[in-house]
Every structure is written in structure tokens, then in C-alpha cells.
Amino acid sequence: MTAFRLVAVALVVVVACSTTWARSLEGSSSPVASLIRGRSLSKRANFDPSCAGVYNRELLGRLSRLCDDCYNVFREPKVATECRSNCFYNPVFVQCLEYLIPADLHEEYQAHVQTVGK
């Protein structure tokens, strides 16, 4: 009976400590705290902080893939970075769009840029 009480008390102490510790991490913005709370740091891997519009993973993925394809065609490092600059609102993105995407889809891609952009 004494062993049971000791285990019960130990369990209560562990739960109380873990709850207090978890609460102390709620206000923390460190990467470790984010992982502990069960949030993935890679959820917004394609997210560009210059994009002030609607966060839409699918649209950002499509726009980012266009830049990746453009880089794969031209193999110039500046293409990959400049294509994504200013949240895809730049001349390099437009050139990649014109080179790789059929003309009837250009307006759709421009609308995507407007949605995720400024």
C-alpha cells in the first residue's frame, strides 16, 4: 500500500511539473519550444517573409516550382533567388513564366502572385 501511494505521489508530481514546464514554453518563440509543442518548423518551408498576402501552401508551391524549373533550365544561381524575390513580383519571374508556361495560363499565375503577394 505504501508503494502504491509513493507511485501515485510521484505521478502527480511528474504531471504537475510537465504542465508547468509546458506553460512556461507557451510564450517562448524558440525553435526548441516550437518542436516541444508539437509544431513542425517546416510547415512554412516555402514561405517568403516578403509575402504579405494570403498564406496558401499550394499556390506558393506552384510559384516556387516555376522558379525551380527556370533555374534547372538556365542553371544560373541568380535565377533561383531573383525569381522568388519580392514575393515573385519581379521581372525574372515574368521571364520564367513566359518561357516555361503556356500563354493561356499566364493570367492564372499572375493571380496567384497577387494572392500571396502584397
Curated annotation (Swiss-Prot):
Q: Which Pfam families match?
A: Crust_neurohorm
Q: A GO molecular function for this record?
A: neuropeptide hormone activity
Which cysteine pairs make disulfide bonds?
A: C51-C87, C67-C83, C70-C96
Kindly state one GO CC term assigned in the UniProt record: extracellular region
User: Which keywords, in A-to-Z order, does the entry hold?
Assistant: Amidation, Carbohydrate metabolism, Cleavage on pair of basic residues, Disulfide bond, Glucose metabolism, Hormone, Neuropeptide, Secreted, Signal
Which is a GO BP term held by this UniProt record? glucose metabolic process
> Secretion signal: which residues?
1-22
Tell me which residues bear Valine amide. Answer: V116
What InterPro entries is this protein classified in? Answer: Crust_neurhormone_CS, Crust_neurohorm, Crust_neurohorm_sf, Hyperglycemic, Hyperglycemic1
Q: Where in the cell is it found?
A: Secreted
Per the record's keyword annotation, is Secreted included, yes or no?
yes
Q: Which family does it belong to?
A: Belongs to the arthropod CHH/MIH/GIH/VIH hormone family.
What the protein does comes down to: Hormone found in the sinus gland of isopods and decapods which controls the blood sugar level. Has a secretagogue action over the amylase released from the midgut gland. May act as a stress hormone and may be involved in the control of molting and reproduction.
Tell me what this protein is called. Answer: Crustacean hyperglycemic hormones 2
Protein species of origin: Penaeus monodon
- The protein's gene is named CHH2
